């Protein structure tokens, strides 16, 4: 707040004079003179006796001096002098209070701006909740969650495919096992047939050996008979008989032997052919069954290896799925904890903002109270100035008569003073008062002095 009063007035009396220097501001009440001003001074000398005193006010190089007249009561006396002193004291306290509040407001504004520069993108008194810096983190988390969900779905699909493949291989294994059991049963049946054929072959061999022994026995008997007959024919006995022609036993025996040999050979050939045929077919069937059994055994081993591989892959996929689920749960827990911390930080910042807003509202109310006090003080200052103007006019209208009877115009200025004040208020778009200017014009002895009082109203918090 600045209050400037410029002008020049002169009060002449027998005791002394009061001087107001241009560029300062002065208030005169009786024998009290107060003059705060930038690069200006105020002095009051009454009756050759001066005394000085000062109080704190706005700016540097501002002071006041108070002088008391020893032998004259001054312009005012009694309660008016005390009232003027109280007004001066209250004005000084008001100026000090306003200065301290302006410094406190400036400090708070700097702190608020610094806090916004550190904790948010807002500037000045804008209370923006900018969470755009968290959007990228949230989008990244969403992408990771979507990727994890897709990966989990792929793993579930692969697991289902592996389970279906395992079921298919299990079904094939059961079919091959049934086929293998059937082949083994056929092989066992063929082995029984082979045993029967072996027994038949042994029986035929026994029969052949028996026939061979019988043939050998017959041959031996025939030889013995032939020897007997030859011995009998070698004697001198001549027997002449008239008989029918005898049967040739040798030819009969030879024929019988040939028939038996042919029959035995035929039986042997038939037995060998049948044995070879059955053996060949049995060997072919055995070889076929052995090849099929070998192929089935190889396929069974391959299926066992595939089953073991699939079981291992299934176990690894199950473990990987479990680890992914654990990792997903842990990641969700971590990000949930981080989001909770961020929410807590946001809540703390909102509480701080609410506290700052409350403090700002309190300062606003205090500022409004100070504005009311300022208005009251301005009214008191106007009253004070009116009193000063009235006393100056009375002092100028008082004539001084010396012993020789000359008129008082020889010692006083007879010029008439005229004051004109203009009040200018500056408002913003919301109707808040930004500045208050009071322009005063004093006319004295055809001279114009400007009195300007400017009041800057601090901007209110939004």
UniProtKB/Swiss-Prot annotation:
Region spans: Disordered: 264-290, 392-413
Q: Which Pfam families does the record cross-reference, listed alphabetically? A: Filament
- Stretches for region Head: 1-79
> Could you confirm whether the keyword Coiled coil appears in this record?
yes
GO MF term list: structural molecule activity
Region labeled Linker 1 — which residues?
Answer: 116-137
* SUPFAM superfamilies (UniProt xref): Intermediate filament protein, coiled coil region
Describe the location of the IF rod domain by residue ranges. 80-395
What Gene Ontology cellular component terms go with this record?
intermediate filament
What keywords were assigned to this record? Coiled coil, Intermediate filament, Keratin
Chain spans, region Coil 1A: 80-115
From start to end residue, where is composition biased (Basic and acidic residues)?
265-279, 392-407
Which residues does the annotated region (Coil 2) include? 253-391
- Region annotated Linker 12 sits at 230-252
Q: Which parts of the sequence are annotated with region: Coil 1B?
A: 138-229
**InterPro entries associated with the record:** IF_rod_dom, Keratin_I
Region named Tail: 392-459
**Gene3D superfamilies recorded:** 1.20.5.170, Single helix bin, Vasodilator-stimulated phosphoprotein
Q: How does it assemble?
A: Heterotetramer of two type I and two type II keratins.
Other noteworthy facts: There are two types of cytoskeletal and microfibrillar keratin: I (acidic; 40-55 kDa) and II (neutral to basic; 56-70 kDa).
Instruction: Tell me its family.
Output: Belongs to the intermediate filament family.
Q: What is this protein called?
A: Keratin, type I cytoskeletal 26
Q: What is the lineage of its organism?
A: Eukaryota, Metazoa, Chordata, Craniata, Vertebrata
Encoding gene, per UniProt annotation: Krt26
């Amino acid at each position: 707040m600045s209050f400037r009063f410029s002008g020049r007035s002169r009060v002449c009396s027998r005791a002394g004079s009061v001087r107001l220097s241009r560029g300062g501001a002065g208030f005169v009440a009786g024998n009290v003179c107060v003059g705060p001003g930038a690069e200006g001074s105020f002095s009051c000398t009454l009756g050759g006796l001066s005394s000085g005193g000062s109080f704190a006010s706005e700016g540097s190089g501002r002071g006041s001096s108070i002088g008391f007249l020893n032998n004259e009561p001054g312009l005012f006396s009694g309660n008016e002098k005390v009232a003027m002193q109280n007004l001066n004291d209250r004005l000084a306290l008001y100026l000090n209070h306003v200065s301290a509040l302006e410094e406190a407001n400036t400090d708070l504004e700097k702190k608020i701006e610094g806090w916004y520069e550190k904790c948010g993108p807002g500037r000045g008194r804008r209370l923006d909740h900018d969470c755009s810096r968290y959007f990228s983190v949230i989008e990244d988390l969403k992408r990771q969650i979507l990727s994890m969900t897709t990966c989990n779905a792929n793993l579930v699909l692969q697991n289902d495919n592996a389970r279906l493949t395992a079921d298919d291989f299990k079904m094939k294994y059961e079919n091959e096992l049934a086929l293998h059991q059937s082949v083994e049963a056929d092989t066992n049946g063929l082995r029984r047939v082979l045993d029967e054929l072996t027994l038949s072959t042994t029986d035929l061999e026994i029969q052949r050996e028996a026939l061979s022994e019988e043939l050998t026995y017959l041959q031996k008997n025939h030889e013995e008979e032939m020897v007997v007959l030859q011995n009998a024919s070698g004697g001198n006995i001549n027997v002449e008989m008239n008989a029918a022609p005898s049967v040739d036993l040798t030819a009969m025996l030879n024929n019988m032997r040939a028939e038996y040999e042919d029959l035995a050979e035929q039986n042997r050939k038939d037995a060998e052919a049948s044995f070879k045929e059955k053996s060949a077919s049995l060997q072919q069937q055995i070889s076929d069954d052995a090849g099929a059994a070998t192929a089935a055994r190889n396929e069974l081993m391959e299926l066992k290896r595939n089953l073991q591989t699939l079981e291992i892959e299934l176990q690894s996929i199950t473990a990987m799925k479990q680890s992914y689920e654990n990792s997903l749960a842990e990641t969700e827990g971590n990000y949930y904890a981080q989001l909770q911390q961020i929410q807590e930080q946001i809540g703390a910042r909102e509480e701080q903002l609410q506290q700052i807003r409350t403090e700002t509202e309190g300062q606003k109310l205090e500022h409004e109270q100070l504005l009311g006090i300022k208005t009251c003080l301005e009214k008191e200052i106007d009253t004070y100035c009116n009193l000063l103007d009235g006393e100056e006019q009375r002092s100028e209208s008082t004539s001084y008569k010396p012993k020789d009877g000359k008129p008082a115009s020889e010692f006083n200025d007879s010029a008439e003073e005229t004051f004109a004040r203009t009040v200018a208020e500056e408002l913003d778009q919301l109707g808040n008062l930004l500045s208050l200017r009071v322009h005063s014009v004093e006319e004295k002895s055809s001279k114009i002095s400007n009195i300007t009082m400017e009041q800057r109203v601090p901007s209110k918090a939004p």
